[in-house]
């Protein structure tokens, strides 16, 4: 500061510009480093409910290749579902247990879903962009105790009939390529539940209001 007082600022800057330039370069490098460290996180507070009009809106197709923003969001969705199934992490980060999530559930109207189904000997997990059901079985399946949803707080008891087997086409973030997935049973039900969100459909829309617990002798009960 004393030097600035004793000489012309322009002359001072011209003599020492390399110092400023070097400092600016360091600042930029630090910013990029911290930007990579700071990743998007989703908590239960980010989940919108069925009282929010956006949950009933149509989600838009996502342009490929994915932008950094879309990639980060889908990864955050996948991380939410994975972490919600870990009791310690779920409690520490305030996560509701989940097996799937759609982008619209965090207020983003884009065709993206994440599903994670753990088994004793492995896991079925996908993070899909623009998922589309391309074939489905005639046979139905349903969860014996009914379905639930992160965006639904009220009670909606009843059976939700879905296709027992489906094939889904889309881009999978985990494999970083376009895929065709064959799913059956619980995995198929969860995929259909999340894909429904992309058209503004909720699980209780499928429940028969007059006979919510009706059964189907030919359907697979899960």
Show which residues each predicted segment covers.
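Positively charged
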Residues: 27-222
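Short hydrophobic targeting helices and cationic amphipathic motifs
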Residues: 4, 9-13, 17-24
């Amino acid at each position: 500061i004393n030097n600035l007082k004793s000489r012309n600022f322009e002359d001072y800057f011209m003599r020492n510009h390399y110092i400023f330039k070097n400092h600016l370069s360091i600042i930029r490098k630090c910013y990029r480093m911290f930007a990579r460290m700071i990743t998007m996180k989703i908590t239960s507070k980010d989940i919108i409910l069925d009282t929010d009009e956006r949950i009933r809106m149509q989600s838009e197709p996502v342009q490929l290749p994915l932008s950094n923003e879309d990639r980060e969001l889908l990864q955050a969705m996948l991380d939410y579902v994975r972490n919600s199934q870990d009791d310690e992490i779920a409690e520490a980060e305030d996560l509701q247990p989940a097996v799937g999530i759609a982008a619209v559930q965090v207020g983003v109207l884009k065709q993206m879903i994440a599903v994670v189904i753990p088994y004793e000997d492995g896991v079925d997990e996908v993070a899909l962009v623009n998922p589309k059901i391309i074939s489905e079985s005639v046979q139905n399946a349903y969860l014996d105790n009914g379905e639930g949803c992160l965006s639904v707080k009220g009670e909606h008891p009843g059976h939700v009939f879905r296709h027992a087997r489906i094939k889904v086409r889309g881009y999978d973030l985990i494999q970083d390529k376009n895929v065709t997935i064959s799913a059956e049973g619980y995995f198929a039900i969860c995929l259909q539940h999340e894909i429904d969100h992309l058209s503004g459909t909720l699980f209780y829309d499928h429940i028969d209001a007059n006979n919510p617990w009706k059964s189907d002798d030919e359907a697979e009960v899960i």
